[in-house]
Amino acid sequence: MKKPARMNAALLAAAWLLAAPCAADAAGPDAETARLIAELGLQESATALADRPGWAPPKTVVIPAADAARLAWMQAAAPGVTLLPAKDRAEAAALATDADAVIGFCTPEVLDAGARLRWIQVLSAGVERCVGIPGFAARGIALSNMQKVAGPVMSEHVLAFLFGLTRGLATYVPLQAQGVWKDDAVPDARMWSIEGKTMLVVGLGGIGTETAKRAHALGMNVIAVRNSGRTGPPYVAEVGLGADLIAFAARADVIVNTLPLTAETKQLFDHVFFDAAKRGALFINVGRGASVVTADLIAALEDGRIGGAGLDVTDPEPLPADHPLWRAPNVLITPHVSASTDLGEEPRWLIARENLRRFAAGGKLLSEVDVGRGY
């Protein structure tokens, strides 16, 4: 079976370079977009935009600036809508005064200027900055994101941390830089075989699901916690609710946080959590840095309650050069790059274009955010 989201970048590029305005563009997604939607399992909103109060066909949409071929490809999805390219946030705010929607920009300035805004498409999975803008929820603006688009590559980043921590790379890579051959630098007890180990995935959305799938394929026993119910895919042995987090943590050799940042998840991983975790467990975070009390994590690493950490996100971020987290034992840190990929931006453009088509037609958006819940 083809690996999710591992599409040929050249084919994706050709999809928009060769596209031309036609009736089919307004009628439904093209084959490449339909395949991407199916592979990622993207969900559409329950209610069509045309069935919501105050609906009227849109006239103007602000989009990120791009070359002429890209703009023509976007325009083909919404022939009756004027597209206004913006090269940065300031230009997007200036253009938003006459816009019905904005793709790629969600800032206080855009919200203040855009009195007519009815839809915003962000080009990331995280929406905490957008929904955190004062008054956003009261505006009733439909918000869609890129949930699941980065799930496959971010789950691979989780595995990179997993292998790095279980094979001593946090110790051996610095020794390599020093030209030191020391085959006993990492005790055998820390050189894990991951087969048969238990992984707890906290948050079973796009990233969590892809992580669970890969961990199961490696022979791990996968358990998970989510808020939406106790059901999950067949490769997850057991699914608990938020109230089960502490009990599940006590059983896990590896804990992976994929949660978005909300009022409920902020500083969720604190000394109480680390005290309850299985001693020596590994902690991997590709969710949000602010979901962790950093001082508590450092303390847990220093006294061995947590055996190591792989962190793509931190609090604060960027992490200052003199921050003690850099020097905590058995830690791998990457600078919020787990979504980076050689696939480029094509999948995001495909989803943005499809949602533009749906918005222009008054249809059901893909990956609409529950603004009240924050994801």
Predicted regions span which residues?
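Oxidoreductase and adenylate-handling cofactor-binding alpha/beta cores
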Residues: 155-174, 216-220, 350-363
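Glycine-rich Rossmann-fold phosphate-binding loop(s) that bind the pyrophosphate
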Residues: 204-205
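N-terminal Rossmann-fold NAD(P) dinucleotide-binding loop
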Residues: 208-209
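Phosphate-binding beta-alpha-beta segment of Rossmann-like dinucleotide-binding domains, i.e.
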Residues: 138-198
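Rossmann-like dinucleotide-binding domain for NAD(H)/NADP(H)
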Residues: 143, 280, 286-375
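Rossmann-like adenosine-cofactor binding region
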Residues: 228-324
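Bacterial N-terminal signal peptides
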Residues: 10-20
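An N-terminal-biased, well-structured beta-alpha scaffold segment characteristic
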Residues: 27-144, 272
